[in-house]
A protein has these predicted regions:
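A structural signal for well-ordered alpha-helical scaffolds and beta->alpha junctions
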Residues: 54-58, 95, 147
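Conserved active-site segments centered on acidic
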Residues: 1-87, 152-156
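Phosphate-binding/catalytic loops
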Residues: 84, 90, 96-156
Length: 156
């Protein structure tokens, strides 16, 4: 069976989407499902990518993951590209602005592949950007909840 390919997306790919990538990876590894999924993350913006080289995960995001025993070493920001549409089955954005930009980058035929993470949860809404709030603990909580709900939906 071919693994389901999931791309988590946020604005800069240094906080929320890499947190989602590595939280989801941990979840599937713990459940023995690592072979069932291929997981990555990317940015809608190039703000964290200079001369083709992406910045590493923002230190407070990396530290929040580490508090939960999750490592993200080696991860660097990459930008979502139109050709990713054929490489991934599902694109999961963190907020409404990400979703708008994902539609712009991926094009009209991507509509059924683009979802917002918190829409998988009963409360919906956006994952607030901790870059502005400095609340990486809240971002972790929301992303964890969203990833749990996403995995449950995919396994249903």
């Amino acid at each position: 069976m071919k693994p389901m390919r999931i791309m988590f997306v946020c604005h800069g790919n240094i906080c929320r989407s890499p947190m989602a990538e590595f939280i989801f990876l941990r979840m599937i590894e713990e459940r023995g499902l690592a072979n069932c999924f291929s997981v990555a993350s990317s940015a809608t913006s190039t703000e964290e990518i200079w001369n083709g080289i992406g910045n590493p995960v923002y230190p407070p995001a990396r530290e929040e993951l580490a508090k939960h025993g999750i490592t993200c070493s080696g991860k660097r920001a990459v930008q979502l590209r139109s050709d990713d549409l054929t490489k991934y089955d599902l694109f999961v954005g963190m907020d409404s602005a990400n979703i708008r930009n994902m539609h712009r980058i991926l094009g009209g035929s991507a509509a059924d592949k683009i979802k917002k993470l918190m829409d998988y949860t009963p409360r919906g809404g956006d994952v607030a950007d901790p870059w502005y709030s400095d609340r990486f603990d809240i971002a972790y909580r929301d992303i964890y909840e969203g990833c749990e709900a996403l995995l449950k939906a995919l396994l249903a």
